Amino acid sequence: MKNSNNGIDILEQQMADNEDICCSCGNINSFPKVFFDNYKVADVGIIVCTSGKFKISCNNVEYVVNKDETAFLSRDVYFSITSHSNDCSVVIILYSVDSIRDILGSTIVGMKFIEMLNPRDCWVMHTGHESELTKYSELLAVGNSDDNVFAANERRLLLLSLTYRLCGI
């Protein structure tokens, strides 16, 4: 996989800094290096395949994610990317709901209830919302600065919107 932009560099730096929101800033043509060796999802993990395909292993179960499909990774799950096609392009969003817990309230309780009803580590599906998830990744990257209070609050609202979108899928 070749990388055509600095989205992977930004994502890897966000992950190294343990930021609440780590996103690829749109499509990227590579995966973070840590994804190839049992990476732990702290809270919410989303990988949208926009072209090609890749294989992901979660707790010794392998899944194939094709173009226009999304892998949803559960909290505290370990996963590894086991292979990918040369034309693979993905959008990655990892975030902690703690940063918006005060806004979400009962929605978080509902999400935990759903996790108890369906405790799978990974779901792979075509949601029909892949282009919207890609757009969220791009929007979350805009104005990514702690110095700008407006941008920080806008990111929290985008994260809230993304969370509600995910609950509707």
PLM segments and residue spans:
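Residue-level recognition of alpha-helical structural elements
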Residues: 129, 147-155
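A hydrophobic/aromatic-rich effector-binding and dimerization subdomain
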Residues: 2-23, 80-145, 164, 168
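Short hydrophobic-aromatic micro-motifs
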Residues: 71-74, 92-94
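Short, solvent-exposed loop/turn segments at secondary-structure boundaries
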Residues: 60-61, 85, 150-151
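Generic protein-terminus/edge-of-domain signal
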Residues: 1-69, 76, 121
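Short, surface-exposed charged micro-motifs
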Residues: 70, 80, 154
